[in-house]
Amino acid sequence: MALLQKTRIINSMLQAAAGKPVNFKEMAETLRDVIDSNIFVVSRRGKLLGYSINQQIENDRMKKMLEDRQFPEEYTKNLFNVPETSSNLDINSEYTAFPVENRDLFQAGLTTIVPIIGGGERLGTLILSRLQDQFNDDDLILAEYGATVVGMEILREKAEEIEEEARSKAVVQMAISSLSYSELEAIEHIFEELDGNEGLLVASKIADRVGITRSVIVNALRKLESAGVIESRSLGMKGTYIKVLNNKFLIELENLKSH
């Protein structure tokens, strides 16, 4: 398959990913097919975001690493010493993707390290390995292009997380601002009583202790529930089961208390 055709396959992977959750496993599989090597997409902290195996490496430590989806801390840290593509590293390199305890089995094993960079920062590393054949210039062009595509997707995922975070916070702030003073007071007491993200409470007991009517508590809970911040379920005589759905809610409530 010609270089141009392989580049188009990577392009189509990028186009297919538009607007969908990032799937690093599919990306790794595509790169495996066009570069014909084992592919590992590793985050800054060594988390294995995606991988695809072209040539099996029989080793218990490697198997566990793939199951845990985590590269060793020391190895991950060392990857930051590789600022640009470093190709065809042998089994004796500290960056080898082969298990050094089986050095004799993988004497011809070659590793290529490609930094994943986006927005001017190091986002992770693309690691490629082969049992023997050298990585040529075409392979390196595809690997670097693949790393660029992966970097774009990591940035997109980050942007979506930031957006979701901002949306969650805005929903909570709107829900809290819709509460009257007595309703807000009731909510503060309810979540002091719960002491966590979910639990059971008896509204009448809180109402009596704080000196507010039960209807104030019910109204406050309804407002938060309609905003999607909590869910509540009546368990009859036992009380009301409450669960926080928006993880920004308790933080915002705590912030209000400290002001």
Curated annotation (Swiss-Prot):
Keywords in alphabetical order: Activator, Cytoplasm, DNA-binding, GTP-binding, Nucleotide-binding, Phosphoprotein, Repressor, Transcription, Transcription regulation
Record family assignment: Belongs to the CodY family.
Residues annotated to bind GTP: Y51, R69
Source organism per UniProt: Bacillus subtilis (strain 168)
Stated consequence of mutating R214K: Slightly reduced affinity for ilvB and dpp promoters
UniProt-recorded name of the protein: Global transcriptional regulator CodY
UniProt DNA-binding residue ranges: 203-222
GO molecular function annotation: DNA-binding transcription repressor activity; GTP binding; transcription cis-regulatory region binding
Pfam families per the UniProt record, alphabetical: CodY, HTH_CodY
Gene name tied to this protein: codY
Binding, L-valine: R61, F98, V100
